[in-house]
């Protein structure tokens, strides 16, 4: 949340307010950004799959129009969520990140996973409902551990084949059923690079709407083992000196914060601000 943005469950039968439109190609934008007068947006020829009330921005109600496909709108274009994270106003990114998670959930829960019947939107809580099964489906949140492994003035960074060319980052992975956060961290580090860790310290968390992760960030000290990269997951992993680092993740990510925080502490620099 921010001073300008708060989430809320709003009834789409309300009138007025602001709205964002999301398609498989991203969010609709014009010269003024991604938040449009709702009445104007609903007059456009959009292929609307569903509508959800998602919160308040600067005191105005905000709604999401989740679209089946992108539509040409004069004076507008489509922009992916990552572009807003890297370049746009961060308050707007918070709105769109939440909208993206709700849109993904709404798109994937149109039908009951038990009986296959259409689900209906509950207007007073964030849930979809199957009346025949009396089953509610809530937005999915996937807990993921992200960890910077440290060894004095060295940090262990790795590359996934999916990364931007040249960029190295921290290790991360999703929790399995029955695991604690610490259990997951130890397992993921062992699986990805075959080293052991100790002195695990929780640092903070960040919502990561790509598509619905909750990143729990840690520092952990190296305890032993030689790096052996996990096939298909890790294409390179090595120790880097805090004085000589490779290209790193985006500054608004918790991965970058874990790195910057440790480096600042080792070098006696100012502690960076946590990405909100």
Swiss-Prot record:
Species, as recorded: Pseudomonas putida (strain ATCC 47054 / DSM 6125 / CFBP 8728 / NCIMB 11950 / KT2440)
GO molecular function: magnesium ion binding; manganese ion binding; NAD+ diphosphatase activity; NADH pyrophosphatase activity; RNA NAD-cap (NMN-forming) hydrolase activity; zinc ion binding
Assigned GO CC terms: cytosol
Top-level EC class as recorded in UniProt: hydrolase
Sequence motif: Nudix box, positions: 173-194
Protein name: NAD-capped RNA hydrolase NudC
Residues binding substrate, per UniProt: 82, 125, 138, 206-213, 255
Entry's cofactor comment: Divalent metal cations. Mg(2+) or Mn(2+).
UniProt keyword terms in alphabetical order: Hydrolase, Magnesium, Manganese, Metal-binding, NAD, Zinc
InterPro entries: NAD-cap_RNA_hydrolase_NudC (IPR050241), NADH_PPase-like_N (IPR015375), NudC-like_C (IPR049734), NUDIX_hydrolase-like_dom_sf (IPR015797), NUDIX_hydrolase_dom (IPR000086), RNA_Hydrolase_NudC (IPR022925), Znr_NADH_PPase (IPR015376)
Binding sites annotated in the UniProt record for a divalent metal cation 1: 172, 192, 233
Similarity comment text for this entry: Belongs to the Nudix hydrolase family. NudC subfamily.
HAMAP family noted in UniProt: Nudix_NudC
């Amino acid at each position: 949340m921010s001073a300008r943005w708060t989430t809320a469950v709003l009834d789409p039968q309300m009138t007025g307010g602001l709205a964002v439109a999301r398609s498989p190609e991203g969010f609709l934008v014009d010269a003024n950004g991604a938040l449009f007068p709702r009445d104007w947006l609903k007059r456009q020829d959009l292929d609307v799959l569903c509508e959800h009330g998602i919160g308040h921005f600067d005191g105005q109600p905000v709604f999401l129009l989740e679209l089946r496909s992108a539509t040409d709108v004069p004076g507008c274009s489509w922009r992916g969520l990552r572009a807003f994270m890297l370049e746009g106003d961060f308050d707007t990114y918070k709105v769109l990140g939440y909208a993206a998670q709700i849109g993904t959930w709404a798109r994937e829960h149109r039908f009951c996973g038990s009986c296959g019947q259409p689900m209906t939107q509950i207007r007073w809580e964030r849930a979809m409902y199957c009346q025949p099964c009396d089953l509610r489906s809530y937005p999915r949140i996937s807990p993921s551990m992200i960890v910077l492994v440290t060894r004095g003035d060295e940090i262990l960074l790795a590359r996934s084949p999916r990364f931007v060319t040249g960029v190295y980052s921290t290790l991360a992975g999703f929790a399995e059923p029955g695991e604690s956060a610490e259990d997951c961290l130890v397992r993921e580090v062992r699986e990805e690079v075959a080293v052991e860790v100790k002195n695990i310290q929780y640092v903070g968390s960040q919502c990561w709407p790509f598509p619905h992760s909750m990143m729990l960030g840690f520092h952990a000290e190296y305890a032993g083992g030689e790096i052996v990269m996990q096939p298909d997951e890790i294409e390179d992993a090595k120790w880097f000196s805090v004085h000589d680092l490779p290209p790193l993740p985006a500054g608004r990510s918790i991965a970058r914060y874990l790195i910057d925080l440790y480096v600042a502490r080792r070098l006696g620099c100012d502690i960076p601000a946590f990405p909100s």
